[in-house]
From Swiss-Prot:
Protein keywords: Coiled coil, Cytoplasm, Cytoskeleton, Developmental protein, Endocytosis, Endosome, Microtubule, Synapse
Protein name: Protein hook
Binding partners and assembly: Homodimer. Interacts with microtubules via its N-terminus.
Domain Calponin-homology (CH): 6-123
UniProt KW Coiled coil keyword: yes
Pfam family, any one: HOOK_N
Taxonomic path: Eukaryota, Metazoa, Ecdysozoa, Arthropoda, Hexapoda
Length: 677
């Protein structure tokens, strides 16, 4: 029972999800605050559930406090019951009221189901009920059945004194609901008219009673006045006894006639209202009979729809049987095709066995070549290490040789400069000797010194000598002139010493400039650098060619390895396919006939395939193996020779210094990268 109720709840929840609401309404927790239900009611009947009423529902109660949720749910349920009693004229005395406390605290599904039943009743009875009914009809049949059951429970709980109409809904469709709703609307309109007529009748009856009371009061007053002898009027004048023909009698008579006329009019109106009420009762009976007829017709429609559903189910079963028949036919055709494929696979399996044997031989041969390749790789690595050590030794020796050559050249230049200085000194000594012989030492010394002195100092000395002569001629015997002469002589000696040191410095600089000319050195270095750059470009080109050759060889080796692995995988795939084909052949032979399967031995096929496997296969000739090994050896030797030549050409660059060689890019990295590949 609980499972069925939960099923009804989930059906109502699926219908509620189809509504376009702003608040979340996908599960029980989102419905427990009452916000989504209030928005749905506002959407169904905005004239009853107004926006001001919706504003009273606190949307901030979600997941905060269950008491706030309970207050929201109380407002919603009370408004729902008011709507049913005032607008729809439903008295839900037998319907169990939803427990809002259990919904707010525990999200009870049973209580939520009752709340959703009430919401469903509002949707079906509102002004836009046609659209909501069509939305319900678009749902699945199981959901429609549960929704119809919920509506039946809601309709059955109405008060019997109200003459409620139980809506009979079919399990397969909800179209009969529309006729019932139309009749219910007509019944509600007639009830409204009866209610209005009854109201008018009550008003007229009240008016009649009031008139009767007024008449009785007037009659009592009339009787009292008749029995009294004297009556004083309002103005204090005695009216005298009530007698025929008196003024008072005539006044009372006139009032009595007026009251009688009013009474007659009220009685006529009452009779008219009675006739109208009888007419409306007859119309109501006719409408009730029409409703009964329509209910019968709806029952017939439901039975016819049930029959149609049964026929549909039988038609669906017939279609399923036809589809199964077609599938069995296709399976029979596939079985015949499989027989043919088994024969083809047997032929292919024999070919695959032969190919498998060939692939195994190829794998063995490739394994041998793989071992040889590994040996060659190790030898190449050893040779590269030896080459590196020898090249490092060669570089050191070249560096030492260059240093020694530089020292030798420096010593040779120093020797040449010393020899030249010796010759120059000899010549000067000879000249000095000749000068001493020819003239005085002072004159020769001054001549030699003047020749060696620069022109500025010579002019200064001549000027000083001229001044000295003038002073000697003008003041020959004075002490001041003697002092001046001594000062001039001291200055001359100082200048001569400075001149001598300058001459020595000039000679040393001239010898140094002759021995080390920077322009010549720059030109020679430029030529050497150009030659070295050309050699470097040539060697780099050779190195790139050797690297490309080695990379192509490495690619070939990797390609052969990949081919070998691919062949091995193909052999394994062929073997597995062969096993599958053998199993299929056994199954097909067994499926032909069990008697034939017992007569035919399945092991015969295995023996046949074993014999086919043991047959000798053509082997690779010895000449082909020798050609492959010789080609591989030649390829390895060529690659090694190219690498060594490029390395030696780079290391033995003519005219390069140690620093210039260190600036060049080492080609060893590319070779090591080639080896690692």
């Amino acid at each position: 029972m609980s499972a069925a109720k939960n099923e009804m709840y989930y059906s109502l929840l699926e219908w509620f999800k189809t509504l376009n609401l702003n608040a979340p309404h996908a599960d029980a927790e989102s419905l427990a605050d009452g916000v989504a239900v209030a928005q749905a009611l506002n959407q169904f009947a905005p004239e009853s559930f107004t926006d001001s009423w919706l504003a009273k529902i606190k949307a901030s109660a979600v997941g905060i406090n269950w008491r706030l949720r309970m207050s929201n749910l109380k407002k919603v349920t009370q408004s729902l019951y008011d709507y049913y009693s005032e607008v729809l004229n439903y008295t839900l005395s037998d319907f169990v009221k939803p427990d809002v406390q259990r919904i707010a605290e525990k999200c009870d599904l049973v209580e939520l189901e009752r709340l959703l039943q009430l919401v469903l009743g509002c949707a079906v009875n509102c002004a836009k009920k046609q659209s909501y009914i069509t939305e319900i009809m678009c749902l699945e049949e199981e959901l429609q059945a549960n929704i119809m059951r919920a509506l039946q429970e809601l309709e059955s709980s109405r008060n019997a004194a109200e003459g409620g109409i139980v809506t009979s809904l079919s399990r397969s469709s909800i179209s009969g609901m529309l006729d019932g709703k139309v009749l219910q609307e007509e019944r509600d309109a007639m009830a409204q008219k009866c209610f209005e007529t009854e109201k008018k009748m009550l008003l007229l009856i009240d008016e009649k009673t009031n008139l009767q009371q007024e008449l009785q009061r007037v009659q009592k007053e009339f009787a009292r006045l008749e029995h009294s002898s004297t009556v004083i009027g309002d103005d204090g004048v005695s009216l005298g006894p009530v007698q025929t023909g008196s003024v008072r009698y005539n006044e009372l008579r006139r009032q009595l006639d007026l009251l009688k006329e009013e009474l007659l009019q009220s009685e006529g109106a009452r009779e008219d209202l009675k006739l109208k009420a009888q007419q409306q009762e007859t119309d109501l009976l006719h409408m009730q009979m029409r409703i009964d007829e329509l209910l019968k017709s709806t029952a017939e429609v439901t039975t016819l729809k049930d029959e149609v559903d049964v026929l549909r189910e039988s038609n669906d079963k017939l279609k399923i049987c036809e589809g199964q028949l077609d599938t069995y036919k296709k399976k029979l055709e596939d079985y015949n095709d499989l027989k043919k494929q088994v024969k083809i696979l047997e032929e292919r399996s024999a070919d695959y066995v032969q190919q498998n044997a060939q692939f195994e031989e190829d794998a063995k041969r490739y394994a041998n070549t793989k071992g040889q390749i590994e040996l060659f790789k190790k030898e190449i690595q050893d040779l590269h290490t030896k080459l590196d050590s020898e090249s490092s030794k060669n570089v050191k020796l070249e560096f030492d040789n260059k240093n020694l050559e530089g020292k030798n050249l420096a010593l040779q230049r120093a020797k040449d400069s010393l020899l030249k200085e010796r010759d120059n000194l000899r010549e000067t000594v000879d000249e000095l000797k000749c000068g001493h012989l020819s003239s005085n030492s002072g004159l020769t010394g001054t001549a030699v010194s003047r020749e060696l002195q620069p022109p500025a100092t010579v002019e200064k000395m001549q000027r000083l000598e001229a001044e000295n002569k003038a002073l000697r001629e003008g003041q020959g015997g004075q002490t001041a002139l003697a002092q001046l002469l001594d000062d001039a002589n001291k200055r001359c000696e100082n200048l001569r010493e400075q001149l001598k040191s300058a001459n020595e410095r000039i000679l040393s600089l001239s010898h140094a400039s002759q021995s080390d000319d920077p322009i010549l050195k720059e030109s020679e270095f430029g030529k050497q650098i150009k030659q070295l750059m050309e050699l470097n470009e040539q060697k780099t080109l050779q190195l790139e060619e050797s690297v490309t050759q080695s990379s192509s060889l490495q690619c070939k080796v990797t390609q052969l390895e990949t081919n070998l692995t691919a062949r091995e995988q193909e052999v394994m795939a062929y073997d597995a396919k062969y096993r599958k084909c053998l199993e299929k052949a056994k199954e097909v032979i067994k499926s032909f006939d069990p008697r034939i399967a017992s007569a035919i031995d399945a092991s015969a096929l295995e023996k046949y395939f074993d014999v086919v496997e043991e047959e000798p296969k053509p082997k690779m000739s010895v000449m082909e193996e020798q050609l492959m090994t010789s080609a591989f050896y030649r390829l390895g030797v060529n690659a090694q020779r190219d690498a060594v030549d490029s390395k030696l050409a780079i290391l033995m660059g003519s005219g390069q210094t140690f620093l210039a060689r260190q600036r060049q890019s080492a080609p060893r990295k590319s070779l090591s990268a080639m080896k690692s590949k």
